[in-house]
């Protein structure tokens, strides 16, 4: 199955891929080949985007902004898990660490649609798909992966996938299937073995749990 678009505007990375980008997780619904036929000359000084894509449709689960430092991607920003003392025995109520830059489906749609209020796709990219995508079909998004880079990827409907976008756009920087054997972390696509939200929570919670245990042991020693 394939589809195509005749596009008469500027189709460059500089035009559509500003911003830090997003990490998006969801359930793969379908994928097909989509071709963009450019009808206008493109700026010579800019980077023209590819014109053949694997169009990946997912049902949105969650998303977070990508985080960078000095041009290197680092894990998303987190609040620290905290322990609040209660009573004279210094018992603790715990406040779990949370992702600072987590976004919902509506926020993602606005960010990647280039101002198109009727769809999560920019105008004239693939208008036939609009009725089947957020916000018209809640939580359904289409992302475009360069055929030359991603056609070898083997996915099927129902797979849980994680997509990193190039800037705040629908264009795919990386995509991985999330299973026990092949799971990507935020910054380096190395094996971790869990979804990104729960994975990073576990790491922060473990650190805070160790700190809390040490504090409780010190408090107990004071009562001996």
From Swiss-Prot:
Record-linked InterPro entries: Arpin
Domain of life: Eukaryota
One Pfam family linked to the record: UPF0552
Positions of transmembrane segments: none
Gene Ontology terms describing biological process: directional locomotion; negative regulation of actin nucleation; negative regulation of cell migration
The family this protein is said to belong to: Belongs to the Arpin family.
PANTHER family: ARPIN
Subunit: Associates with the Arp2/3 complex.
Protein role: Regulates actin polymerization by inhibiting the actin-nucleating activity of the Arp2/3 complex. Involved in steering cell migration by controlling its directional persistence.
Protein name (database record): Arpin
Gene it is expressed from: arpin
């Amino acid at each position: 199955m394939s589809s195509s678009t005749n596009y008469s505007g500027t189709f460059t990375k500089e035009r559509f891929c500003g911003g830090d980008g997003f990490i998006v997780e969801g359930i793969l619904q379908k994928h097909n080949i989509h071709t963009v036929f450019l009808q206008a000359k493109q700026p010579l000084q800019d980077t023209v985007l590819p014109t053949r894509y694997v169009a990946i449709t997912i049902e949105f689960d969650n998303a977070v902004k990508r985080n960078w430092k000095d041009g290197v991607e680092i894990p998303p920003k987190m609040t620290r898990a905290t322990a609040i003392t209660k009573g004279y025995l210094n018992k603790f109520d715990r406040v779990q660490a949370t992702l600072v830059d987590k976004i919902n489906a509506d926020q993602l749609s606005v960010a990647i649609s280039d101002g198109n209020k009727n769809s999560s796709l920019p105008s004239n990219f693939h208008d036939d798909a609009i009725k089947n995508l957020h916000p018209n079909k809640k939580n359904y998004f289409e992302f475009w992966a360069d055929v030359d880079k991603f056609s070898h990827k083997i996915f099927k409907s129902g797979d849980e996938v994680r997509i990193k976008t190039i800037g705040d756009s629908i264009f795919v920087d990386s995509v991985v299937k999330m299973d026990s054997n092949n799971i990507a972390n935020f910054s380096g696509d190395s094996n971790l073995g869990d979804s990104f939200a729960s994975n990073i929570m576990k790491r922060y919670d473990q650190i805070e749990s160790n700190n809390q245990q040490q504090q409780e042991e010190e408090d107990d020693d004071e009562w001996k």
